[in-house]
Amino acid sequence: VTMMTTYPDFTHPDKQQRERELEYLAFDFAQAAQLGIKYIRVLAGQAHPGVKREDGIMWAVEYLKRACGIAAKYGVVPVYEDHAKPGAWDYIDFSHPADIFTEIYEKTEDVGLRVNFDTANIIAYGADTMEVLQKVLPRLETIHAADTSTRGTLNHCEIGKGLAPFREIFSLIKENGFDGWICIEEGSMQGMDGIEKAVRYVRKVWGEVK
């Protein structure tokens, strides 16, 4: 297992709950280390009603930095994702908007926080995938290969059949020396057939681009 995905809610308006979220994540780090899992996908938190932009960013930055210190003790690597809305949450990701995601990215420099770039979520927000990827490229560690059939909302589809610009993405990261993990996020509900088609497509495109 290469990656464990977690759902820390560091933008919760209750400070006590934010502290609990950090404790939960610390336990996840410990579990991952015991299982030999290197990467831990982390998020900023939910877009709770009433939480101001500046407060949410401040809290997310504070707790992500603290989380990185804990992760280092366990020898695991936290990777921050441009997420949309996980089924486990009531609200969308606070940093689903591309400008918030990149601001949190910029404010967590030099603490060991790397990036897991999802190929569909920026499109689902309605922003420019390549523009955002270019900004976070210096700390790119892993990729979630996913696709969406619509812009402005997330509608998972068979990988390679939607709007995600895989050739452009792979070309850019290859040019910049990326040789990390590309994880398949198959959401077209086709079971193993969908996973096999996604793997074939990703391998084909990766092999074709320079």
Predicted stretch roles:
Residues T2-T5, R41, V79, E141-H144, ...:
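Conserved beta-strand positions in the central sheet of alpha/beta enzyme cores
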